[in-house]
From Swiss-Prot:
One of its GO terms (biological process) is SRP-dependent cotranslational protein targeting to membrane. It catalyses: GTP + H2O = GDP + phosphate + H(+). Residues 444-466 are annotated as: Disordered. It is found in: Cytoplasm. PANTHER family: SIGNAL RECOGNITION PARTICLE 54K PROTEIN SRP54, SIGNAL RECOGNITION PARTICLE SUBUNIT SRP54. Part of the signal recognition particle protein translocation system, which is composed of SRP and FtsY. Archaeal SRP consists of a 7S RNA molecule of 300 nucleotides and two protein subunits: SRP54 and SRP19. Pfam families: SRP54, SRP54_N, SRP_SPB. This is Signal recognition particle 54 kDa protein.
Amino acid sequence: MVLDDLGSSLRGTLDKLQGKTTLSEDDVEEIVKEIQRSLLSADVDVDLVMDLSDSIRERALDEEPPAGTTARDHVLKIVYEEMVELVGESTALPLEEQTIVLAGLQGSGKTTTAAKMAWWFSKKGLRPAVIQTDTFRPGAYDQAKEMCERAEVDFYGNPDSDDPVEIAERGLEETADADVHIVDTAGRHALEEALIDELEAIESAVDPDRNLLVLDAAIGQGAKDQAERFHDAVGIDGVAITKLDGTAKGGGALAAVDQTDSSIAFLGTGEEVKDIERFEPSGFISRLLGMGDLKQLSERVERAMEETQAEEDWDPEDLMKGEFTLKDMRNQMNAMNKMGPLDQVMDMIPGLGGGIKDQLPDDAMDMTQERLRDFEVIMDSMSEAELENPRAIGQSQIERIARGSGTDEDTVRELLEQHKMMSRMMKQFQGMGDGDMQRMMKQMQQGGGGGGGGGGGLGGMGPFGD
């Protein structure tokens, strides 16, 4: 993820306090300077970095660590709380009828974000509709229509009209049954007067409940001026940051939030319509510092299980009752794939997103995903009987399956060994009572190790239980 380098740098800085029980002024100053370097290299605005540094320095020197708390954990808690304060609250988006206008420069990801937001609202039980008003960019209508079809949400646009205001007004009429209207507007390569005039006219015509500014994570230091101009024109209520799965540094968008006195609403984390997260400050910073985010993880697990259950006529609860088959394993892997890239999932698990992940080779995630794909191809080459009873698979079947899947016999055997291990684990879970499961979840929340330092937040709570 785009902010991985920032998170790794911050965790490395805090790890320098490992084993210390007290803090000297020199310790604090070194930590503050390292944090400044990390944030500035991530394109966070200089003024914001200085304000954050002053707060961390003052608290680290003035506050006494609670009894039994290490110097590292004390500073970690301070950094966590101050960074949550820095990114601010999430934009208020009640699950009710509303109209949202998206603004931003061309190429910022407005059209993709419109479809993603519509998909997100649909998963919350509302009926959304996207209204495409961009008459400036060739292909805007086709892209929006295709994205909305993939998201399975209502769409309105008129490729034959060159009047964006008329399209917006007609769109509201044609999609009157929708609960949430998301109006996608045109962009330009620069903040031209024509763009601002058009945006103001659309805003006046549709009278939106909220205006969201869509910013590419690569915007850097230019975010502040851009945000100020849009805010002066229509008033910005929140920011959606896109392309956080790329190589941009991402910190510049925080200046836009500060400049407009608004907050972050959504994060775009990939190319698929489902690759969008509602911004939750405590979980976001918790992940950044290697402490996990169990709330976001549980939402992804629930969504992935529901989708797999619908597609495969498979109930995950059956795993706790009978024999764990290769078919069950394949369904589990399908659900994992639906949760998103493996490195993002690891960031949400306390103890894995920090120290353990930082120690892995750069290509470890890609290799793991590739091996999972190999396993899926192998299982697709098996008969129904083999999927239901893998213990009956002998050498001749292994040879046939390897040929049919285009893999080698060793990889087939590796899959069978992996299944045996998972089958043993499932038997252990089947023997657990509710109390055992609750204790295990509590250990996960408190777990960490490596570069951890605390559990991820559940139910909106931070890793320190505030």
